[in-house]
Regions:
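Residues forming the Rossmann-fold NAD(P)(H) cofactor-binding site
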Residues: 103
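Conserved GNAT acetyl-CoA-binding A-motif
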Residues: 113-124
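Acetyl-CoA-dependent GNAT
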Residues: 8-95, 106-108, 112, 147, ...
Length: 165
């Protein structure tokens, strides 16, 4: 039986683990920045929350699969509306992709959110993130709108997708 754990990132060692995940996912980060991710990018991701969101709604976690740290998930509860989860980041190391692990981990998260009585999950995917779009479509997410969001490089078109759970 697969064992999945979400680990709170609350010390420098765990921040370095998160950075390691970022560095091993160059496909995604090349879409949003010309620079390699740094520890300050990790720290920024850990603390950044939209206006009006409480700190207890923010969940930035390492993903451990059978005792191996291989991903990061960052999500907000009850955002942008009550009973909705917004996943802001879900990445798996490049060398661990295409093995069904992302799907197993997402199903674990989905079940956990459903058990906590959330009704839907929302995500935003860069238009040019073909790997991400393919993954989320396989998880039965449907496009609800498109918008432009500011990233380090520039404004980028994002496809907002949603799934009822």
């Amino acid at each position: 039986m697969d064992m999945i754990k979400l680990i709170s990132v609350n010390n420098d060692g765990l921040k370095n683990e998160a950075l390691n995940i970022y560095l091993k996912n160059d496909y995604y980060f090349s879409k949003i920045s010309d620079n390699l991710p740094s520890i300050s990018a990790v720290e920024e991701d850990i603390k950044t929350i939209p206006n009006g969101v409480q700190k207890n709604q923010k969940n930035y976690r390492l993903i451990s699969f059978n005792d191996e740290i291989l991903g990061v998930v960052d999500f907000l509860t009850d955002y942008p509306e009550k009973d909705t989860i917004l996943i802001g980041l879900f990445i798996i190391k490049n060398d661990k992709q295409k093995q069904g692990l992302g799907t197993k981990i997402f199903r674990y998260l989905e079940k956990s959110f459903k058990n906590k009585k959330f009704l839907k999950i929302r995500i935003g995917v860069l238009v040019d993130n073909e790997i991400g779009l393919s993954f989320w479509k396989k998880q039965n997410f449907k496009e609800i709108e498109r918008k432009f969001l500011k990233f380090e490089k520039s404004k980028k078109e994002v496809i907002v997708m949603e799934k009822e759970i």
